[in-house]
Amino acid sequence: YKQQHVGSNGRKFSPSRNAHYVKYIGEREHVLKFSHESNLVKYMGEREHATRHSDNGLFGYINGSFSDNYSTSEMQNYVRKISTSHRSVFHSIFSFTPESAEEAGLRTLIDWEEWVKFHISDISRNMKMKQENIEYLAAVHLKEGQPHVHIIWWDKAQEILINKINPVICDQIRIDVIKST
């Protein structure tokens, strides 16, 4: 498990960097997407440059509801807007071996979506945030030998910027996720 909310310079991620991260996770190669021809999941080994907004792998919980049909540009604009001076926007990655993903039952995009929905509670609990205030976007990358899920998330009710996260908290998130997977 890896979690960041500041760059190597120690400064919080800018609104444009957070917006770029949305595009990066949703459209990069190896992203897992629903096929448009059927309701089956299809693995995309190469990036497709289609303009339809469903041609990305983004899913998440925004404005009180879950969706797996977000427009990249609309979500980039939304993330830019919520990336205020008083709100921390976190970038998290959960990585697996192919064997551990199989053991966890992560075979389809729906499996991964359910996994993220379930484990957002581990993140919110350890970060001492109310789960109902957490919004997130996520995308699964089936990188050879290292399937993983990127999650960009924030507390929509946050009023004070979080400058530093104790590494023990991130480790506890990792431990809790392992225990409950």
State the predicted function of each range.
Residues 1-147, 151-181:
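N-terminal nicking endonuclease/strand-transfer module with a His-rich metal-binding environment
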